[in-house]
Design a protein with these regions (language model features):
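Segments that shape or occlude catalytic/ligand-binding pockets
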Residues: 1-13
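Low-complexity, intrinsically disordered regions enriched in charged/polar residues
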Residues: 3, 48-51, 65, 98
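A contiguous, low-structure linker/loop signature
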Residues: 10-63, 77-84
Length: 167
């Protein structure tokens, strides 16, 4: 498989304060994790902490063709394997990180118009990304999405069909 090259407009930041490590992502979210307690983290400060920021939300440059040059070179090599590319997110994960998960779940009910607009922005960027991945020579995409816990989904099937199926 292959993924996107680094961004021209984003530089990853990482810093430690006491026992807590902070880092950012391309969307502008600030994450944190315990230095000696976890390898992952959780969103500490979401990029979209106020719906009034939605119109001006800075999107990652996943649709910059330069980010696909290494991928195209990789996929241009002869192989007998299926050429898969990693997609940098999906509508549910990216959107819930932008709002912070516990807020995002409330937003699904209380701020449906804003949620639909956010999902459209994220989906639009990911659609452009998929097209560029295809132009780079990928034959398929892979994305990771955590839609549930061990014994159930996080969102009921009716809401899922209404909110996410269109995207």
């Amino acid at each position: 498989g292959s993924g996107l090259s680094g961004s021209d407009i984003y530089r990853h930041r990482r810093w430690v304060e006491g026992e807590v490590e902070y880092y950012d992502d391309e969307w502008g979210n600030i994450w944190r994790r315990m230095v000696n307690g976890s390898t992952g983290g959780e969103v500490f400060k979401p990029a979209l902490d106020d719906w009034r920021k939605l119109d001006g939300l800075r999107m990652p440059d996943f649709d910059n063709p330069k980010r696909y040059e290494e991928m195209a070179a990789h996929f241009a090599q002869p192989t007998d394997r299926f050429k898969m590319a990693w997609l940098p997110g999906w509508v549910f994960a990216s959107s819930r990180y932008l709002r912070k998960m516990e807020i995002y779940f409330m937003d699904l009910i209380e701020y449906r118009e804003e949620i639909d607009c956010l999902h459209a922005k994220v989906t639009g960027l990911l659609e452009r990304t998929i097209r560029l991945i295809g132009k780079a020579g990928a034959e398929g995409v892979i994305f990771c999405e955590d839609l549930g816990v061990q014994d159930r989904v996080l969102i009921g099937p009716e809401m899922w069909r209404d909110v996410f199926k269109p995207h």
